[in-house]
């Protein structure tokens, strides 16, 4: 009895017994918290897997990724609340596993993610954080943009399709003759064909060039901000579904004349 009393007195010096029980309950509730990924969130994860094959889940409603070359960074605000941290080395493989279940329920465990339904279950082991290329913790401070324009997805998609059909390796956002154009181009060949769509007006002259493979965007309309410092921000304007932001580096032969 005396020994137990001494132990409880020591506990009270740090926290009450009630607090200790609450902490214990929170701990076990964390690892038994059931959640499901919506179709929108699955689509975000599929998109992010094309940017970086790995991802680090963090507590909260934000998913983020960065390409291994650090030329693309993306962030999505999703409807689900991720309960704990967990690294996934092969995101496309995890998505494939989840597709085996008709109505997958997900639990974040200490060392793995458990995917299950009424009959089946998979324990998917987390990867070490050091194995995953992750975005910086600090939020991006985007420079004051010299150009800002809104692009409809149909126009962006049309130019990307044209680039594929015409075998053009780059997409350009250009300001010329008072218009903002999105173009499929080959900037290294001045005689190459150009496919262009007018998406706005401007009084500036510029040509910001992106590798086609770097424009890994989900099908939304976007507000595009362009900085002469070599970066562009694409922010989705959708009112329903995940809010997305992409930061994409421009190629070194981009130009801004003001």
Where are these regions (language model features)?
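Long, charge-dense
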Residues: 131-149
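DNA polymerase processivity clamps
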Residues: 12, 19, 25-126, 145-258
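Serine residues within intrinsically disordered or low-complexity segments
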Residues: 3-4, 32
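Short hydrophobic transmembrane-like helices used for membrane targeting/insertion
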Residues: 1, 21-22
